[in-house]
Every structure is written in structure tokens, then in C-alpha cells.
Amino acid sequence: MLSLKKYLTEGLLQFTILLSLIGVRVDVDTYLTSQLPPLREIILGPSSAYTQTQFHNLRNTLDGYGIHPKSIDLDNYFTARRLLSQVRALDRFQVPTTEVNAWLVHRDPEGSVSGSQPNSGLALESSSGLQDVTGPDNGVRESETEQGFGEDLEDLGAVAPPVSGDLTKEDIDLIDILWRQDIDLGAGREVFDYSHRQKEQDVDKELQDGREREDTWSGEGAEALARDLLVDGETGESFPAQFPADVSSIPEAVPSESESPALQNSLLSPLLTGTESPFDLEQQWQDLMSIMEMQAMEVNTSASEILYNAPPGDPLSTNYSLAPNTPINQNVSLHQASLGGCSQDFSLFSPEVESLPVASSSTLLPLVPSNSTSLNSTFGSTNLAGLFFPSQLNGTANDTSGPELPDPLGGLLDEAMLDEISLMDLAIEEGFNPVQASQLEEEFDSDSGLSLDSSHSPSSLSSSEGSSSSSSSSSSSSASSSASSSFSEEGAVGYSSDSETLDLEEAEGAVGYQPEYSKFCRMSYQDPSQLSCLPYLEHVGHNHTYNMAPSALDSADLPPPSTLKKGSKEKQADFLDKQMSRDEHRARAMKIPFTNDKIINLPVEEFNELLSKYQLSEAQLSLIRDIRRRGKNKMAAQNCRKRKLDTILNLERDVEDLQRDKARLLREKVEFLRSLRQMKQKVQSLYQEVFGRLRDEHGRPYSPSQYALQYAGDGSVLLIPRTMADQQARRQERKPKDRRK
């Protein structure tokens, strides 16, 4: 403090006190150059602006730093964390959680509320108005205990601190402050409230009892309903399939709880079951988002009305309503239209659907699953393109096509592609006759693939459209087979063999290259005009009249045969000129009367006679001599190279012969060594046998360590001491060494 007194004068202190009384906070730390703690920290204590705060661990104060729960900097920290979490949450979708603060204003006395009296509790606002949330069975709950009513309020989010007569106002304020701090830190009241945990345990017991009741009910009619209800793997909810299995079996399979108005008037009835609590707002938000996603799909309401004529009181007709038709705006290529086999995971069809009657007023039905007479109920086919062509596309309906089944996979098609298909169906119905249909089928069966402009009628189709219309107009084939045929025929678009080839000397021909792209299957993403720069397409003539008769071709366009022959001869001459050497060009320029072959290859006598027959100038004679000299040198060089090549080839053959001899000798050596080893083994066995039979005067065998056998020159065998045998062996080893020296 002594070092600070020389900086802080009396006037400065008075001025600082005056500003602090006014409310202005002065920071004089910038004027101080000492290493002591700043003035603000001395007066007000440490702050997060001047200390290293551990933002990830506020309660850890082992290193001397941290934020106190009652510090003024705590609000700034939570604000920064909240903003940071909002920024991080921008890249993912979050369903907002609704918190409803409900306060009990008036409550009837116990026992006065009946089950039939309308509940005066809370109501949630939905798209259809105010609907009761508690349901008809909450009246009985209200007549039980006060604790049960409070539990219902806690489920709605109206959680207030418990008020008791023993707590003072200061205690209530302190509890409220601590509770809000816990919420800011991420811990809700359900962590500390015992009654809330008890409530969750009771709810779990009720759900378990409901599951047991459902198991007993499923033994009677659950098999019929299981074919029509699909269970979500994440939430466990049951929702109806797009095609009801049997109309008569549905009312029997519905439980008795469907008569309650809570299921019919619930906020999210299409996806809520009878056992779920309507107070779970977070679950209701998730169900609402799933309903919005289902409404974005292409669903035909007319088919649902025809296929399922339910009574007015049927809960399936009231709860599971189909969404209206909406445009399909997803940009998905048709190359991805083929899906994997889904025989077990995607049970969309049932055998009862195949037998449902459909209207047959139209002659050419669009390609939808309802037009097929051999639908595969297990989806064994891997090509599901037949499901992607409903007649009602983007609001353009075909009234004569008959009722259709709802298409859950219609969202996978491009909108522009669907417009083209719908216009194609209209063109078929307006001006397409059976004769044109037969012609079109013949063109499909041709080996040359699909041809463009094959018919000049107003209803003629292009290659890609024709293949799609043929598959969509067949009402006798299955959806999978027709779809696979349509896409298999698309691959034939490209080249046509109907164009005639010209009988040219260079085998030049006109190739029927398709100038426009295919709408479905593009064979190449390059511009056809870029192919003209390729060298091997230099002589290719693009003739796009290959669909016409051969007699209709204009003969004036073909050049006369004489010009063709002249052109071919000129090309041959140019080719020969390119192959000529420099001496040949010089001889032609000097007008030499004979060829270079005669100049080079004729013998000396014949060459002199040839020169004497013609009157040649000195320049011609010198050129002829140079050509002969260079030719002879060239021939000599060729002969030299030939001799060298022959020598190299002879050496190569000799080396190969030596390698073969070496391999043969190595094989013989191996055989000799093997035979020698066998002989040594036989001699050793014989030596042991003979030595084992020898006995001394007393009839005892000789010791192998003291005696050894020695073969004599005459074939006899001698028994000598081991020392003498070793000396003789060493002497025999020294003799070859002395010879080498």
C-alpha cells in the first residue's frame, strides 16, 4: 500500500469517491504500472474479467479460482453459454418444448365431480380448436385425493415449489432462487422431488399393466390387426398400414376403448394409442412432426374410401385419416428408383388387397399396383419402379383410370418427370390405337433397340416415352415385371442398325448416332458435337434418315462411282508419296528413267549396260552413282547387322544348350549322391552286424571303442585296435593334401 500512496493523491481519491457515489465505475488500473493486484480487485474482490475462470467446471476451486453461486458474473456466464448453445443448435432440428404454467384458481369440493360432468380443468389449443386434455377418466381422479390432482398438474409442466405453513417468506424465496439456479445448470425439479419420482414409478406400473392387458387381448384378434398395423421401431407406436387387410375383420380387432371420445377428439389421435397419457407434451410434439411428414407424401383419398368403407363410429376411420394429394417436389433421379428387396421389412401388400374390385372403365390403365393381377405380397422383386407411377401426378388427375391404391413411395420421383408421364398417358388415351400399339411392340422386339421418330402420328412417342408407355399400358402383366421391362428397354437407346452402309472402297459407312439425350437413361453426358474431333470418326457420316425406306433415300446425295474411284486412287498415291524415301524423290525430280531398285540391286555389268542405253546428263549420272553407293552401303550395313544378329542368336542357342546340360548334370549328381548315401548306409549296417558277431577267446564281444574292422586289399576283414585305425585314416587324409600342394 505504500507504493500506491505516491500515485493516489487526496484530490484523486475525492474524485474517485464522487464518481462512485454517482454510479460511474472508474478503472484506474491502466494508469498503474506496478505488479500489485489491481485496485478494483482490492476494493470489489476478484472478478471473472480479471481471473482465469474455469467455465467447464465452476465448482472446482482447488486452484483458487471459480465463480461463486451468488456472484454477479454468474448471469453473464449463463448468458454466454445460452447464446453459444443456440449457435451450436442451428445445424440441427429441435422440437421446442412447451412449458405451461397452470394455477389452480377454483376447485370443487371432493365428491361433487361426477364422471359425466364436463371437466373444468386445462385445455390445450390445437388446430381444430380447444380440446380437453384430461379426458373423461380424469373426473374420477379428481375425486380421489389432492395429491392426484397435483400430479396431473405436474405432468403439464406447472411445477411450483411446495408451499407449507411451516416455511417463512425468506425460506420460500431462497428455495425459489436455488431451484431456478438448478434449472439454469440443467437439473430439473424431478431430480430432487420424491413425489415426482414416485409418480413416474406409478406411470411405469400403469404402462406395464396396459401391456399385459394388450397381450391377453392380442390372443383373440391381434393376428388380424397385426397385418394392418405397422409398429414404429423407435417409439413403439402402432399406426395403420396404407392398405387395410380386410374390412370385416377390422371392427372385431378394435378394442373396446375406441368408443371413448378421448381417442376421437384427441390432439394427436392418428398416432396415439389408448394406453398413452395425453399429458406428455414432448411426445405429442414428436407425433405432430411425424404427422406433418406423412401429410407431405402422395396419398390418394379416393382409394382409401373405396377400399375401406368403415362405419361412422369406427375409430380407424376417425383417427387414421389420409392426407390430401400434395405435389412431389423431391429431386430424385430415376436411376435410384430400384430399391432392395423388402420382403420382410416392408409388408405393404396383403393377399386381400389383390382381390379387391377396381373399376375397369379405362382401356389403358396407368402403371400402379392396383392394375396388377399378380402382385407379389412379399415384395420379392428388387425393382419397385411400378410403384412410382400414379395417375394423379401433381394435381393432374386422370378420371378414367379408375381407383388407385395410395402410393407411399411416390415422393421419390422428380416433379418434371411425373409431368411428362402424365402428359404421355393423356396422349395415349386421345390418339393411340391398337395398330400403333402393335407397331410399337414390334419395334421393342427388334434387335436394333429403340428408334426415334418411328411413327409420325400426333401420338407418336420418343424412345424413352414409348418404353414407359408400353409398360404402363399393359394391364395384364405384374407391376414388377412391367417396370423391369421398361427399364431394361431403356438401355437399348443409342445406335440403330437400320441405316444403310455405303459400299465404299475404304469401308466408309453412315452410323445412326442418336443426336438427342435419353430422358431416363443417359448413355453419355458429353455433347455429341464433341465427338467429331476424334480421329477414328473422321470418315463417319451422320445419316439420321435410317427410319425411312431404302428406296426413299435421295440418290442425288451419293457421289458417282467414278469420283469415288478417283478419290481412292488419289489417296493411294498420297500414301505412296509419304512412303517414298529422299533418294526416290530426288530421282523423280531429276527424271531418272529407271527405278532405284535397279540402280542398287543390279550387278556391275548389267548396271553399266543400263547406263549405256540412256543419254544421261552429268547431274543424273552423279545422282545415280550416289544412289547406288548409298544403297550398297545400306545393304552392307543390313548384312552386317544380320550377321551380328545371327551370331547373337547362335550364342543364345548355345547358352540354352549349356543350361540344359547343366540341369541334366545336376540331376545326375543328385542321383549319384543319393545312391552313394544308400551304399554308405548299407556298409555301415553290415559293419555293425559283422562287428557284433565277433568274440574273443573267452566268448565276450569286442568293444567298439577299442577295436575296429579294416578291409584288406584281397577282400578280407581284419580286427585292429582303434588307435591304429585312426592313424591310418589320418594318413589317407594327408595324401590328397600333399598332392594339391
Curated annotation (Swiss-Prot):
TM stretches of this protein: 7-24
PROSITE patterns cross-referenced by the UniProt entry: BZIP, BZIP_BASIC
A Pfam family hit: bZIP_Maf
Region of interest: CPD: 350-354
Compositionally biased intervals (Low complexity): 447-492
Site (Cleavage): W103, L104
Biased composition (Basic residues): 732-741
Summary of the tissues where the protein is detected: Isoform 1: Widely expressed including kidney, brown fat, white fat, large intestine, small intestine, stomach, lung, brain and liver. Isoform 1: Expressed in mouse embryonic fibroblasts (MEF). Isoform 2: Widely expressed including kidney, brown fat, white fat, large intestine, small intestine, stomach, lung, brain and liver. Isoform 2: levels in white fat, lung and liver are increased compared to isoform 1 (at protein level). Isoform 2: levels are elevated in brown fat and brain, but are reduced in liver compared to isoform 1 levels. Isoform 2: Expressed in mouse embryonic fibroblasts (MEF).
Listed result of changing S497A: Abolishes phosphorylation by CK2
Region (Cholesterol recognition/amino acid consensus (CRAC) region) location: 191-199
Glycosylation positions in this chain: N319, N331, N394
Protein's name according to its UniProt entry: Endoplasmic reticulum membrane sensor NFE2L1
Organism of origin: Mus musculus (Mouse)
Originating gene: Nfe2l1
